[in-house]
Design a protein with these regions (language model features):
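N-terminal amphipathic/hydrophobic targeting modules at extreme N-termini
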Residues: 6, 10, 46-47
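Low-complexity, intrinsically disordered or signal/transmembrane-proximal segments
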Residues: 12-15, 59
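Short, Lys/Arg-enriched N-terminal segments with co-localized hydrophobic residues
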Residues: 40-51
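Active-site neighborhoods and metal-handling regions in enzymes and metal-associated proteins
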Residues: 52-54, 58-66, 82-505
Length: 505
């Protein structure tokens, strides 16, 4: 195929997205340069249906030409990639507008500047629909009725006087770059709500998973008491509005990930494996939970991740029995204690990669050896886990995964020799006795799958149970496919013997 034909093909591929097609205006600037190129063009064209249906043709015809690269074409490719990424976020907002067609989805950027954190951490939902990681305090409004999105930016962004330029400024340039209809100063927010105040409009929002009420109930909107403080003021000023919590519905929109998201999750998972193995090696009698946590955090950074995706849990003894670990969020010491011989540790860790979360865990004996009763029960627990993991695939429900887990658990009823194992099997075979047993999604945040599992979703299979003050837990990350599930966290021990060997290294 000739050079001109290849250029025409590239133009056709890119014009599969109207937004990406506009970027072709820069290509004539580099007409005289050799087409040696760069695989980023594949990303720039990913919005094209033709490309999605003819991936191999695109790779063999075009990418073959763009193999070595030259600077001008690299500039062009980066520009095209930026446009394609903006188109991705626009597509996400379109899906949100369709989902919330009867109202307005409001997503608030993080406002907290925490000097004790490793950096600014953006609200995951705001980031998913904008891609803005350093924009503080902004508000995104996705109007389902008009099918338009508004980004309201603070008039005085933080540290502007100190020379820190905001990630994005209000105006037409930002609207073009972000593929957003309106990027304006938040002084216009009042007029935006006033223009909708004559209608009975639902204002959808997402509550934080671990946020506590900031005001007493008698000061909150009676129709939407669970709404955040900033929303309470809006509901008070315009009573026709009704706030509706929509966290699960937003998570469902995020559940099936793009190629780029899956790549980030693979990296998060890989670094999390390294962090967990480091944590296993740090568990010793007399050590503090804090000392293990610090080893895990350091291992995430050493593996190339952006630290931990959540502060590690190295919960020993009673601290590992649910729901006790949750109380660590409200404690200055994070339930820190000294690890005691004979106890089991819930080692639950995750590393963050490009905002995406890893999550992985094992039950670890403080003494570096399970006692005979613990060993028998752990062996049964692992067998049940593996039976549940085998049925993971698109179309399977969480109840079906539990049934497979329970069936294998009960199969060991007659062969179990210890009282601990026999009583555990009897108790755990009833769903009501293992209320924290779960399958959850993992991406920018964690969520609960809605309906059957879908291909392209990253999930964590995480049975959680306890007996006699001992917590048992096992967790891996999986990418759901049509035919099964790909384990994203290989290389971590399962058996008692393998865990003990890892502790001895």
């Amino acid at each position: 195929m000739g050079l001109v034909a290849e250029l025409l093909l590239l133009r056709y591929l890119l014009q599969g997205s109207e937004t990406a097609g506009k970027a072709l205006e820069i290509l004539p600037l580099f007409r005289e340069w050799p087409l040696k190129g760069i695989p980023l063009f594949r990303l720039a064209a990913r919005r094209s249906l033709f490309f999605m249906d003819n991936r191999r043709l695109f790779q063999t015809v075009v990418v073959r030409r763009f193999l070595l690269g030259s600077f001008p074409w690299m500039v062009a490719a980066v520009a095209l990639l930026s446009v394609a990424q903006s188109a991705d976020f626009a597509e996400r907002r379109q899906r949100a507008a369709n989902e919330f067609h009867d109202g307005i989805l409001l997503l608030h950027a993080s406002s907290e500047l925490n000097a004790s954190a490793d950096g600014f951490h953006q609200d995951p939902y705001f980031y998913y629909f904008t891609g803005l990681e350093n924009t503080v305090g902004a508000l995104l409004a996705i109007d389902g009725k008009s099918n338009e999105s508004w980004l309201f930016l603070p008039s005085h962004p933080p540290f502007l006087r100190s020379g820190l330029q905001p990630e994005v400024k209000a105006g037409p340039d930002a609207e073009k770059n972000l593929a957003l209809k309106h990027v304006v100063d938040w002084d216009e927010l009042k007029g935006f709500f006033a223009s909708h105040s004559a209608e009975k409009v639902s204002l959808y929002f997402a509550s934080g998973s671990f946020q506590f009420a900031e005001l007493p109930g008698n000061l909150l909107n009676t129709k939407s008491p669970e709404g955040p403080a900033w929303l309470q003021l809006i509901l008070q000023k315009w009573p026709a509005f009704e706030g509706k919590e929509a966290g699960d519905r937003i998570q469902d929109l995020m559940a099936v990930q793009s190629v780029e998201e899956i790549a980030a999750l693979r990296s998060a998972a890989k670094s999390t494996v390294a962090a967990l193995m480091a944590g296993i090696g740090a568990v010793k009698p007399g050590s503090s939970q804090r000392s293990v946590e610090s080893v895990v955090e350091d291992a995430c950074w050493r593996a190339g991740a952006h630290g931990s995706s959540f502060w590690p849990w190295a919960m020993g003894g009673d601290n590992a029995v649910f729901p006790h670990p949750f109380t660590s969020f409200g404690r200055y010491d994070h339930l820190n204690s000294i690890l005691r011989p004979g106890d089991l540790v819930r080692l639950d860790v995750g590393c963050e990669w490009d905002h995406y979360q890893g999550d992985l865990g094992r039950t670890v004996p403080v003494s570096a050896h399970f006692d005979p009763d613990q060993r028998e029960l752990w062996t049964i627990f692992v067998a049940a886990y593996q039976a549940g993991a085998k049925v993971l695939r698109a179309g399977v429900t969480i109840d079906q995964v539990f049934d497979a887990w329970r069936k294998e658990l009960v199969n060991h009823r007659r062969s179990a020799t210890s009282s601990l194992a026999q009583r555990a099997i009897e108790s755990w075979s009833h769903r009501s006795q293992v209320p924290y047993w779960q399958v959850h999604t993992s991406n920018l945040a964690t969520g609960t799958p809605v309906g059957p599992l879908r291909a392209g979703t990253t999930i964590n299979f995480e049975p959680i149970a306890s007996i006699d003050g001992q917590g048992f837990f096992l967790e891996d990350m999986y990418l759901i496919t049509v035919t099964g599930a790909e384990l994203l966290t290989p290389g971590v021990p399962y058996s008692a013997e393998a865990i003990e060997a890892a502790m001895g290294k």
